[in-house]
Amino acid sequence: MKSLQTICLLFIFIARGTSDKCEICHGFGDDCDGYQEECPSPEDRCGKILIDIALAPVSFRATHKNCFSSSICKLGRVDIHVWDGVYIRGRTNCCDNDQCEDQPLPGLPLSLQNGLYCPGAFGIFTEDSTEHEVKCRGTETMCLDLVGYRQESYAGNITYNIKGCVSSCPLVTLSERGHEGRKNDLKKVECREALKPASSD
């Protein structure tokens, strides 16, 4: 995977908490410091998200604090197995002020392949991405397909296409997505049962 894709993806999934002002920042590591900004409706919640791209034993982590609509807060915890052994993990925490607490990002579980598989994709700046087969592990019994874009002043429109194995489906749906002042739009959120290999008989 290209390093540019890795850096850009670290700042895609964001959230916010109910407040007049929220801290705005993004950076590598577990925390960041920034500036206060008023949060107009519908982006009227403060939030903090940790994004981790993990290829055991190495991981790249970033933090983003911003104002967002409550629909994105429903993403909560997302662990997507996008390539064999490669995970994109996000922890979104919304709160009523700009000091949102972290949700834990424990180490990747050691689990065996469970015989299921999903289409996998990891695309940035495009809604199209070449698919490959991801062999699901452990409790990963669902396939997630996520397409959307995020508008940021530092990077413009970041379009993304992410597919892979997940243990559970995120609560957010397209009917609840909201356009967040045209800054964030989920164009596709599909979650279905993982596939079984075709019988050799």
From Swiss-Prot:
UniProt cross-references to CDD domains, sorted A to Z: TFP_LU_ECD_PLIGA
Keyword Glycoprotein: yes
Positions of disulphide bridges: 22-46, 25-32, 39-67, 73-94, 95-100, 118-143, 136-165, 169-191
SMART domains: LU
InterPro entries noted in UniProt: CNF-like_PLA2_Inhibitor (IPR050918), LY6_UPA_recep-like (IPR016054), PLipase_A2-inh_b-type (IPR016338), PLipase_A2_inh_N (IPR004126), Snake_toxin-like_sf (IPR045860)
Keyword Disulfide bond attributed: yes
Keyword line: Disulfide bond, Glycoprotein, Phospholipase A2 inhibitor, Secreted, Signal
Subcellular location: Secreted
Tissue specificity of this protein: Expressed by the liver.
Primary location recorded for the protein, binned into one broad class: secreted
Gene3D superfamilies: CD59 (2.10.60.10)
Record's signal peptide: 1-19
Glycosylation sites: 157
Any one GO molecular-function label of the UniProt entry: phospholipase A2 inhibitor activity
Processing after translation: Glycosylated.
Cellular component annotations (GO), alphabetically ordered: extracellular region
Known partners and oligomeric status: Homohexamer.
The family this protein is said to belong to: Belongs to the CNF-like-inhibitor family.
Function: Inhibits the enzymatic activity of phospholipase A2 (PA2). Binds to the major PLA2 toxin of D.russelli siamensis (Daboiatoxin, AC Q7T2R1, and AC Q7T3T5) at 1-2-fold molar excess of inhibitor to toxin. It exhibits broad spectra in neutralizing the toxicity of various snake venoms and toxins and inhibits the formation of edema in mice. May bind to PLA2 through its proline-rich hydrophobic core region.
Protein name as catalogued: Phospholipase A2 inhibitor PIP
Species assigned in the record: Malayopython reticulatus (Reticulate python)
